[in-house]
From Swiss-Prot:
EC number from the UniProt entry: 5.3.1.23
Site feature: Transition state stabilizer: C178
PANTHER family: METHYLTHIORIBOSE-1-PHOSPHATE ISOMERASE (PTHR43475:SF1)
Gene Ontology biological process terms, A to Z: L-methionine salvage from methylthioadenosine
Record has Isomerase as a keyword: yes
The entry's keywords: Amino-acid biosynthesis, Isomerase, Methionine biosynthesis
Keyword Magnesium attributed: no
Source species of the chain: Aeropyrum pernix (strain ATCC 700893 / DSM 11879 / JCM 9820 / NBRC 100138 / K1)
InterPro entries: IF-2B-related, IF-M1Pi, IF_2B-like_C, Initiation_fac_2B_a/b/d, M1Pi_N, NagB/RpiA_transferase-like
Lineage: Archaea, Thermoproteota, Thermoprotei, Desulfurococcales, Desulfurococcaceae
Protein name (database record): Putative methylthioribose-1-phosphate isomerase
Amino acid sequence: MRDIDPSLRREIESLERFLKVKPLYFDFDEGVFVWLDTRLIPFREVYRRTSDYRRVARAIVDMEIRGAPAIGVAAAYALALAAAEAASRGGEGFIEALSEARREIESTRPTAYNLFWATARVYGAVSEAFRRSGVDAAVRAGLEEATRIYVEDVRGNVEIGRVGARLLESGDTVLTHCNTGALATAGFGTALGVIRYAWMEGKDIRVITTETRPVLQGARLNVWELRKEGIPFKLVVDSAVGLIMSRGMVSKAIVGADRIVSTGHTANKIGTYMVAMAASRHGVPFYVAAPASTFQPDAGPEAIVIEERSPDEVRGVISEAGYVRITLGDVEAYNPSFDVTPPELITAFITDRGVIEPPFDVNIRRTLED
């Protein structure tokens, strides 16, 4: 799995100047997928490596890899690895094995639309190459399509940052919820990427990040990324958002998204709806930053599936010592991983295609079709 279009390698090299952190990538020399295990951040930086698509799927389930764009890239490479494994069967049973792997990968995280978008692209590329030229061409096509998705994500994230930075001014204090930086993408970030780009432009920006219970993506991952960038920040508990907005401590709020449908309804990390309501109540602009691959323009809010995760995530926290229980082990806990923010609470979407303003039911489709 080393033979790909040289232009793709050159494009990866040209984009690496934007990547202070490489959270995931494909090692073409060894033929393995590599990722930074985000469960261990900020205490340790450990990279995992595999050529087994099942291991990548498990990494998505266990949130070693998380964030919709990152999940999409990982799923793309997982299916490319599955194609390489299926090739050992020869022509007979190749598509059947690929389809089985696709179903397994798509079952990992039901809310993130990027996952389904990415696997559909890789599956289509592999199937077409197999039909035209056979197994070897199909394996190469899968790896190249996954790499295109990787390149598009980095390039798109940088463009989101450039577009969104225009909305920020020196002196702004920006609130963000959950991790939407390099660790949630192929390497630059969406909402946190907007903040990063504005900082790179020399704007005096300050950040307030929520801790983001129950998995603490803000307290663990945002803190790690913001400190690496040298961007000033404060960490607050999720339930402090209303108070700090009521005191005028927030200029703008920017979050990411896991799925955005045609109406503008937005699925994102649990607690986002609460942030949006507080922002609306206190007149704080509320932006959602996401690439085009997160939008599902042919679907309505009924298409959004809310993932429910293990109650143990609520019963305990991840610490430097590992998982630490904070309540009784038999307490009944409910753990929806996402909520849905209605479009009337959203000021605009910041995308790699530009800023999308209301009416969203018209402008989302128009922007994505241009």
